[in-house]
């Protein structure tokens, strides 16, 4: 056993031939002492168990078990030596392991690295394989039960008999909770697969210092083990270890692999094949030998300490000096460009800021900020440092230029002016000079492509801000950019113009050949630009027509006109003062009729002026206004439309006058009257709202709201105007939010204001919560959610409209599509106290009847929303002051509403943090009666939710099991089971668990519990649970229970169960059956005198050694109680059968058990 600091010394205490020494361990079952064999001087560990903790009928079985276990012998298990029984205690003598347990090493030196864990777990598995081959289930594998020697070898301790002492408890849950397998928690019996789960938990314990769920209490941890699909795995583990752990943590024990197969896993095999690592490299390799076995314990301890120091050491944030020379400030070294295909689709939408055009012999390059010369004329008089920097600098980005202009035949040029606008803006940011005397001719570029994408920090249009950046000095750029576009098949001529981006309103030259020049350059170099086609949604851009020579005026107009498409007529764009960002949003409106006429006249005058410069070559009789008006333009002169426009203008003027009256200087009657008239006008002409905001904005209204001595009825009138203005207008709402409208209006929500003012405030808030994501986020940012909760606190009878509006607003918060997760809204509302208020509103709205018909459903849907939130919200909702009013309303709800509320309670019960609150609120008492409904709407849903809730509440907790029993759940459970309802999967585990609660058994007696359990023996998947319930029950109330079992009919049920049990459940029924046979003599005799022994003999060839061992134990027990043991031996010819097992069985324990049984048989036959 493990070695610890001396706690207590036993003086002059001798047990057999052993002296008791210091206490080296304590547990719930007893105390462990270091002992000294006074005959040979060997040190041993002696476990002392008080006889009062062992039932008298089980003492002999435990001593017999020790006699069996002392035959086990393996390097990786602690050896049982003997037992000594005194008047008061039972002493078990064990092998002494001097270096303590792995859990003690963790506490002393820190958590283990993965490589060392692998070395130790390999030995654990080897010891476990041996135990399982002998038919022994450890049941309590953990770090404290894995002991180490000074050589670093490990040994498994506390197996077999140690767990028998815990079997005496009524619950019969064996093992330590955090390492316990789910099937043990659910009382389905322990198997060898249960040990595999515990090994996985032990690995996590060694890696992290604690087992899974160690941060929880024992009961919550048990709940999570059963509830979760898999325990949380440590971060940073290797993929092989992760796969290994997933094999251990299969929830279904039948899918869990054996210890033998785990030894063959690649994670374990790596520790065997791993070669020793040099000292100091890796930290752990030098703690193992060449085969992966542990070295001296001192070396291992040192390595563990070093490993923990490294993982706990804070990383240094000091920057190391760079081996590369530091780049000069202002220089940007770009990576080498990649070759690109001649793909022209996106070149002008993604254009770099800096463009340098070299001479005609060199390709266009994108250079750094500093001026540069053409590639072939680069000076070489740089300093060595500069040369080194230039060598390290990647080559500049190149702008590829086609040698020949590309001619496009695409007549669709709707996007051309968009690109011209962007390029003109870009060229406005270039500073051209004339430093070079020999300039090459300007290239005629159709579509320049760039070999590198633009910087992500560029402006939206892909260019700079137009000369404001001091770093963008392009004084040495020798070449201009020129565009030679083809706007359409009917465009002819060659004109010149310029686009200047220094002004706020950019203009673009309106000629077939557009050129860009720099006004600051003495020798303007024109840049031919190739415009691109804008998308169909873009707004037309402004274009200045040229004044150079052209054809006749009629031809000029034809060149720029569109046939039959007034929307695509570019003649009216020249006067539009636009912003590219505004254009992109599509907010530039179409000019009215007068503007279009002015544009057409101006264009015609220019065309006429140009015709006089054509030396009389044009046709003087041509009507230059022939195409100015089409027949469709007659609609603009419609009398009705003009009357409507006049009426609109008068109304606009009236609204502006009324708005001017909304000032603090005006009398209150005037302000109220103005507000009333404004509301009427806005209802009749909603488009006037936009005009109002554009001309006056919302500031005048905001100023009125800030008046301190304003009367409540005036305030109410102003709020009505605000609500009318923002109604169904998202733009105005957002503008109002941006100028602080939300906090200015929210202050009127307090109970000190009249109900009318609060109602208008609630209307405003409701609109803010339901229109757009932006207004909702602003409302929340202004801490508006508590306001909604305050509205709900208003007296329902007096302010029901206010309460309803608050409920609507809360629902809108959850229904509006928002990037904020709904769980965050639940957390915020929960923090504001909403959950305490909603149940009261639900009660009042139910009592209100038809007047509030829809609001109970809305509130119930909110309950479902909150019950599905995170653990913090669920725990708040499960508070007694919240859940109790909800439970009180259950009987008043309609069936559909009841099903929804029960669903929300079920979702709460799935969180272990809520179970105690639900119990204290009386959830079991309120919900159990609903199981009695047999007909009606939504009955199946109601039963499902209630049984699920009871399943979570009663699981593992005897106190709640008893509460459910006295509240009458047993008859309902029996109904669902006997009627073969789909819900019996929840009813069966509940009723089987009730037998483990001593208090609940009194209710089971009232409902024929023993007979019901016997009937469950026919249920294929619940045979083990039902038989285990009988075994637990007969232990405490032997006489009453055995009187029911010990009948011929029920004995036949037991034999039939034994005969027909499938292989998966057969191993599970043997232990509870053995317990019943050992405890109840009448049952034992009835089975022993029947053909049951024949059935046992047929099963003795089972492959599982644990099954064979339990079968031999059953034969032994039947033999000891048989009224005619000699006849039994002869009748069933047991001696040769047992002799064969004793001679040939591979399990040491099975052989030993058979040998002892054979000795008893031979002694009886001799007698």
Swiss-Prot record:
Keyword Cytoplasm found: yes
Ranges of compositional bias, category Low complexity: 377-405, 431-448, 493-507
Spans annotated as Disordered: 311-553
Chain residues that bind ATP: 24-32, 47
Ranges of Polar residues composition bias in the record: 365-376, 508-517
Domain Protein kinase positions: 18-268
Residues forming the catalytic site: 140 (proton acceptor)
Role of this protein: Serine/threonine-protein kinase involved in the spatial and temporal control system organizing cortical activities in mitotic and postmitotic cells.
Identification of the protein by name: Serine/threonine-protein kinase sepA
Species the sequence originates in: Dictyostelium discoideum (Social amoeba)
